[in-house]
């Protein structure tokens, strides 16, 4: 069961990690919906929490697509490149 993630935690993940989190959340949502349909779901709030987690992940992915925020791996790599270039000069 995936814990409720904050947007800041999601922004610190790489693109591949976000895709993995999204896949896990969608699988969990599928399982929860199946449990609800068969009457086995004991915690209805979990459905809402997982849907919100999926929305948060999509939001972070869209922010990166629009250039509002960057991929932390790419941002760290760019900072390292800038540091080495300034040392060479």
Swiss-Prot record:
Q: Which cysteines are joined by disulfide bonds?
A: none
Sorted alphabetically, which InterPro entries does this protein's record hold?
Ribosomal_protein_uL29, Ribosomal_uL29, Ribosomal_uL29_CS, Ribosomal_uL29_sf
Source species, domain of life? Bacteria
State a GO cellular component annotated for this protein: cytosolic large ribosomal subunit
* Presence of the UniProt keyword Ribosomal protein in the record: yes
Give the UniProt keywords, A-Z: Ribonucleoprotein, Ribosomal protein
**What HAMAP family does the record point to?**
Ribosomal_uL29 (MF_00374)
PANTHER family from the xrefs? 60S RIBOSOMAL PROTEIN L35/50S RIBOSOMAL PROTEIN L29, LARGE RIBOSOMAL SUBUNIT PROTEIN UL29C
Q: What protein am I looking at?
A: Large ribosomal subunit protein uL29
The scientific name of the source species is Frankia alni (strain DSM 45986 / CECT 9034 / ACN14a)
Q: Could you tell me the gene encoding this protein? A: rpmC
């Amino acid at each position: 069961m995936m814990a409720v993630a904050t947007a800041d935690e999601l922004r610190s993940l790489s693109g591949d990690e976000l895709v993995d989190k999204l896949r896990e959340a969608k699988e969990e949502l599928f399982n929860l919906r199946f449990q609800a349909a068969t009457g086995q779901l004991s915690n209805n709030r979990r459905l809402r929490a997982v849907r919100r987690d999926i929305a948060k992940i999509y939001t972070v992915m869209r922010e990166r697509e629009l250039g509002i925020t960057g991929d932390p791996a790419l941002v760290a790599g760019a900072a390292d490149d800038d540091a080495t270039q300034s040392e060479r000069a």
